[in-house]
Amino acid sequence: GLIGAPIAAPLGYAAPFARAAVAAPVAVAKTVVADEYDPHPQYSYGYDIQDGLTGDSKNQQETRDGDVVQGSYSLVDPDGTRRTVEYTADPINGFNAVVHREPLVAKAVVAAPAIAKVHAPLAYGAPVAKYAFH
């Protein structure tokens, strides 16, 4: 019979594959467009935000004239002070900033406490407890 007889089986299966045709790369000429160069760039901008709903209060302004940039910005810090930063940048001195901090609300002037003179009450003697033993 067929029981116990060796059976020949292939070692693995593989699907045939197609090879893609490889073409040599083609050189494509690109046109180089030179960026416009401004030898003395200039700009100026600024904004101011005062939002009563969110409490957001900040502003900024900046100008550039050639290689010199000057500007400032301010905002309200979480502790309630206004921080203002004034800055300048140029090729000779680099970037420099000065920071100012100012309270938003003027400090309230508190008057010195009034000292009232009060007379001490008359002194009374405390009652003495007496114990009797029988």
From Swiss-Prot:
Residues 38-80 are annotated as: Disordered. Residues 40-106 form the Chitin-binding type R&R domain. GO terms for molecular function: structural constituent of cuticle. Keywords: Cuticle, Repeat. Sequence repeats lie at residues 23-26, 111-114. Pfam families: Chitin_bind_4. InterPro entries: CHIT_BIND_RR_consensus, Insect_cuticle, Insect_Cuticle_Struc_Prot. GO terms for cellular component: extracellular matrix; extracellular space. Component of the cuticle of the larva of Tenebrio molitor. The tetrapeptide (A-A-P-[AV]) repeats found throughout the protein are also present in many proteins constituting the protective envelope of other species. This is Larval cuticle protein A3A. It comes from Tenebrio molitor (Yellow mealworm beetle).
